[in-house]
Amino acid sequence: MKVLHVITGLGVGGAELQLRSILQHTRHESDVVTLYNPGPVAEMISGDGGRVRDLGMIRNTELPALGRLTRLIRAGGYHVVHAHLYRSCIYGRLAARLAGTPVVVTTEHSIGETHLERRKMTLGVRALYLGTDLCSDATIAVSHAVSQRLIRWGVAARKIEIIPNGLDFTRVAFDMCARIRIREEFGLPQDAYVIGVLGRLDPIKRFDLVIKAAAPLLDDQHRLLIVGDGQIRPDLEAEAAQAGVTDLVTFAGERHDVAAMLSSLDLFIAASDQETFGLSVLEALANGIPALYTTCPALDGIETDRARQVPGTLNGLRQEIAAEMAGGRRPREGVPAIREQYGIEAVTRRIDDLYERLMARRSRTRQHGPQQNRPSAIGGNR
């Protein structure tokens, strides 16, 4: 079976890295097309032996790109088109149906209560999403929370499949040599207690709250490491300066060595205002670090003393950080339930199985004729 993954861009981000992991474990022949910004993850996928094409879009609204994508899909003879992220859902769904692709699947990686991938949920955004959803056979929600948000938004429950993000445990395993090396690289004392955050420097991640909460607790033996880059980095650096902890807060910038960066930490903090899954928290736990988080749907129903949900307020977060630090550095320890539920191999099998079920259903429909009163995506009956 031939599968084409359509994604908005391939800069470093959770959805982009998740796609790479899926490609490494799928049993189907798979290609990738990015609407624009091939970025570092495109290089990673190419390095793995995958094929990545850049559609070359330069604006969000570019109708000729729809024609280019349709021709690319038709020429590739793909059985499945799988779209990831909002913009690629709009273009990918439409192009796939225009190209006559049998199966169209979407994964919704990042839908919050009020925002969809950092864009406000306006009537226009919703109309485009729901309108092109008519072209889709199924939408993968990465958590129950995402599923419920999609249903409230107007997506039919029968079209939603809950398949969580997968975690490659070998990719994020603890490495003592890497711990020593990273601490040397950034001038962090080997015996210091290092708190860390990881992700795109975006307001919704609330790294400013972490800086404010941790600032009074920092000294030469208690440091904060911020891993990631983004437009608000100057604001965060100013926040650290205003709090008088410039020398105690280290900005590592964008990094691709996730396991090494996590290995350098003693406590992980995730203070996002809204979260659809919480992959970074799972990665930290898989590395053996205790984690404090404000929201992490991926941990719903998982009992562990290695992760604790904390208040999203300044004083509340500060108290929880102080309490964790007071107990000293915890030994590295995994959470077996996470491996059982979120291993990338099992998750990818579920996605591959979904493709095959949908393809079989489409084949049966063609053999036995269309079902009555079931309109197709662009007119007529399926």
Where are these regions (language model features)?
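A conserved mid-protein helix/loop that constitutes part of the nucleotide-sugar donor-binding site
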Residues: 13-21, 193, 197-216, 231-237
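Short His-centered aromatic/hydrophobic patch
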Residues: 83-91, 108
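Conserved acidic donor-binding segment of nucleotide-sugar-dependent glycosyltransferases
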Residues: 307-315, 323-328
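Short hydrophobic beta-strand element within catalytic cores of glycosyltransferases
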Residues: 34, 290-293
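Aromatic "clamp/platform" in nucleotide-sugar-dependent glycosyltransferases that forms part
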Residues: 254, 273
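N-terminal strand-loop element at the rim of the active site
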Residues: 5-67, 149, 231
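Carbohydrate-associated surface elements
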Residues: 145, 166
